[in-house]
């Protein structure tokens, strides 16, 4: 696996000093970040909206949907799931379909094969490798055979920007996750800028697009 140097002063993964993503304080932090700096003045989400829409993902299950930033850009009847009930409530207040894991399991229209695609954006870096594998194992059956899987993670500056990021997940790690889950990789790419920009631009992303076995 690729070796990413530890950030001085960052919390050690898995220790009590690592902030939680499950509480109301994390939801409030996400809401503040939505309105911070240049985001108040410019349509900074436009490139990322275009990137998702050009993939033509159909009905999407968005794992770790947060406040619905990506869910807003997904197809009709797409659904988000998040372990943070406060974030789920915010999504619903925005008119989005979102559930906690228990709520999703009980939803009549979210059974096996009911989604065209699975989106796992800015989630894998928040959890240990085994937990990430379990998430994929749990939710992949909800995607129809031949459907798409999109996994997105931050590059260097973005990784360092959040103390809840506990694990570096680059192209190599994404491919390993795909292989273990039986996902056929169609392509990987850096977005919105070429790979070297990840060392200076906080919103550069690793993207893997794959296919669920038929």
Q: Where are the predicted features?
A:
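A short glycine-rich, Lys/Arg-flanked "PGG" loop and its adjoining helix->strand segment in the class I
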Residues: 133-145
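Conserved beta-strand signature within the Rossmann-like core of class I S-adenosyl-L-methionine
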Residues: 146-154
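Short "lid" loop at the C-terminus of a central beta-strand within the Rossmann-like core
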Residues: 154-159, 193
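Core SAM-dependent methyltransferase catalytic element
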Residues: 194-214
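Conserved N-terminal segment of class I S-adenosyl-L-methionine
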Residues: 1-119, 133-136, 189, 203-207
């Amino acid at each position: 696996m690729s070796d990413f140097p530890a950030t001085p002063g960052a919390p050690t993964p898995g220790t009590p000093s690592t902030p939680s993503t499950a509480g109301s304080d994390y939801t409030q932090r996400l809401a503040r970040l939505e309105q911070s700096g240049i985001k108040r003045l410019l349509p900074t989400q436009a490139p990322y909206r275009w990137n998702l829409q050009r993939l033509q993902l159909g009905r999407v299950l968005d794992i770790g949907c947060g406040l619905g930033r990506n869910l807003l850009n997904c197809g009709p009847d797409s659904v988000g799931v998040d372990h943070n009930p406060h974030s789920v409530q915010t999504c619903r207040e925005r008119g989005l379909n979102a559930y906690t894991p228990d709520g999703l399991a009980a939803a009549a229209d979210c059974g096996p094969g009911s989604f065209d695609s699975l989106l796992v954006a800015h989630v894998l870096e928040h959890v240990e490798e085994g937990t990430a594998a379990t998430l994929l194992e749990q939710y992949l059956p909800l995607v129809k055979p031949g459907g798409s899987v999109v996994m997105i993670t931050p590059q260097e500056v973005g990784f360092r920007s959040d103390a809840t990021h506990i694990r570096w997940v680059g192209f190599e790690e994404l491919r390993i996750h795909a292989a273990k889950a039986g996902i056929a990789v169609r392509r990987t790419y850096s977005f919105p800028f070429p790979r070297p920009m990840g060392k200076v631009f906080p919103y550069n992303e690793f993207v893997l697009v794959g296919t669920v076995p038929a």
